[in-house]
Regions:
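Active-site nucleotide/adenylate-binding loops and adjacent lid/helix of ATP-dependent enzymes
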Residues: 28-112, 164
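Phosphate-binding site of ATP-dependent enzymes
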Residues: 84-165, 186
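A short, GP-enriched loop/loop-strand-helix hinge that lies immediately N-terminal to
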Residues: 1-32, 47-50
Length: 192
C-alpha cells in the first residue's frame, strides 16, 4: 500500500543512507501504480488487460461490460469492483474514487487467477488462487478459509513455464530485484 510499497519509504531510506530489503524506490513506484506499470510493461510485450485510466471529474466515452474498476495505486484489492452494467459501473467508480483521484477501468477477464513469486530474478512454482465465492477481493484475501490456494497449480507444464517467464519479464522490465509477486490470469481460451 501507500508509503511501504509505493517507493516512498525506500526513497527516504536511500536519502538517509539506511539499508533495507527489497527492491529500490523507482521499481516499487512502477509496480504500485497500475497506470505506470502498464506504460512500462505493455511496450515490453507483456500481456495485460485492455483498459483506460480515468481521473476524478472525467467520464469514459465507452465502457464494455463487464469491466473491472480499481484505484490506480491501491493494494490488496481495496476498492476493486466488477461492473456488469451502467448502474454498477457508476457505483464502482464512486467507490474507487473514494480511495484516490485516478482509477483504472479494465476489460473483465473470465478465467482462473494465479500468482507467481519471483526470488532473485527466478520464478518459483505457480500458485492457483480460487476464492470459494466471488472474486479475489480484500475479504477473500484476508479471511481465513475463504480461498483455496494450490501449489503447484494444476495446469500444463508449458502454461506454468509461460507464466513463470512473464513473471520474470515483469520484474526485469520494471527493475524489480530481490523478491516480488506477479498476479496472472488464464482466460477460458488458454491465454495468459
Amino acid at each position: 500500500g501507500s508509503n511501504g510499497e509505493d517507493g516512498k519509504v525506500q526513497a527516504t531510506f536511500d536519502l538517509m543512507g539506511i539499508r533495507y530489503t527489497g527492491t529500490d524506490y523507482l521499481s516499487s513506484a512502477i509496480s504500485m501504480s497500475k497506470e505506470l506499470a502498464k506504460k512500462v510493461l505493455v511496450p515490453e510485450g507483456i500481456p495485460m488487460p485492455k483498459g483506460l485510466t480515468l481521473h476524478k471529474g472525467h467520464k469514459a466515452e465507452y465502457v464494455p461490460f463487464p469491466c473491472v474498476v480499481k484505484p490506480c495505486c491501491g493494494g490488496s484489492s481495496v476498492g476493486v469492483s466488477i461492473a456488469h452494467n451502467e448502474k454498477e459501473f457508476e457505483a464502482a467508480l464512486a467507490d474507487a474514487f473514494s480511495y484516490e483521484d485516478t482509477v483504472l477501468v479494465e476489460e473483465y477477464i473470465d478465467g482462473r487467477e494465479f500468482s507467481v513469486a519471483v526470488l532473485d530474478g527466478k520464478a518459483l512454482p505457480v500458485i492457483e488462487i480460487e476464492p470459494l465465492e466471488g472474486f479475489y477481493d480484500y475479504k477473500n484475501k484476508y479471511k481465513a478459509g475463504s480461498t483455496k490456494e494450490t501449489c503447484p497449480a494444476d495446469i500444463p507444464d508449458d502454461v506454468a513455464s509461460q507464466m513463470q517467464f512473464w513473471a520474470e519479464k515483469c520484474c526485469q522490465s520494471a527493475g524489480v530485484t530481490t523478491y516480488a509477486r506477479v498476479d496472472e490470469l488464464l482466460d477460458r481460451n488458454g491465454n495468459i
